[in-house]
Amino acid sequence: MTRWQKVYEDGSPVRAEIVKGVLEENDIPAVVLNKKESVYQIHGQYEVMVPQSDVLIAINIVKNEITF
């Protein structure tokens, strides 16, 4: 069973999907978890998760190759 770890979070689903796409372009599997409250959509975040084995590389990509 693969353990997943958060490498990015944001209130915007678009930014989370962009981060996911960049990670996947670099052969890092990624998923977006919607942690938003389902009723009012004002609380919570979108989290980008990667397998634990890819965390260091993913964090490096997020910090150095992605700007918003």
Regions found by a protein language model. Give the residues of each.
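Acidic/polar low-complexity segments and flexible, solvent-exposed patches
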Residues: M1-F68
